[in-house]
Design a protein with these regions (language model features):
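Adenine nucleotide-associated cytosolic modules
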Residues: 1-136
């Protein structure tokens, strides 16, 4: 996928467990390297459980915390970005549509007075209902 280098980008990732937890740091690193206006929003309503520690990107200190919150705060801080997350499951089309709506960047980035951001949706979910929602 080719995006113009001066267009703001918003990435919305559904799922912060086995797949999402491992790709999140790489997305933050990529956005940092691209050095363009960007947002990365991680969505997951699940909490870190002991069984997750073996195969997911969490530590014992994260137990009981929301997965999206942990990943967003950890890696946004590392790369000097704003932590954006939704500590809830995205379960209906209205909620997803609101998340992926392209926002204008007026005011926040004066170089982009009315530019619409490019939106990328990443489905890193572990259930069929959420996968189907991503394809609608």
């Amino acid at each position: 996928m080719k995006l113009p280098t001066d267009t703001p980008v918003k990435i919305v990732m559904l799922g912060a467990g086995g797949t999402g937890g491992h790709i999140a740091p790489h997305i933050y690193r990529l956005l940092y390297a691209l050095d363009r206006p960007s947002r990365f929003i991680i969505c997951d309503g699940d909490k870190v459980e002991f069984k997750n520690l073996v195969r997911q990107n969490f530590s014992p200190a994260d137990l009981g915390e929301n997965k999206a919150k942990i990943l967003a705060e950890r890696y946004a801080a590392v790369f000097g970005m704003e932590a954006e997350y939704l500590p809830a499951f995205v379960e209906d089309l209205d909620m997803l549509t609101t998340l992926i709506h392209a926002d204008g960047w007026a005011g926040e980035y004066s170089r982009y007075p009315t530019v619409r951001e490019q939106v990328i949706l990443i489905g890193a979910v572990d259930n069929d209902k959420s996968r189907q929602l991503c394809h609608k």
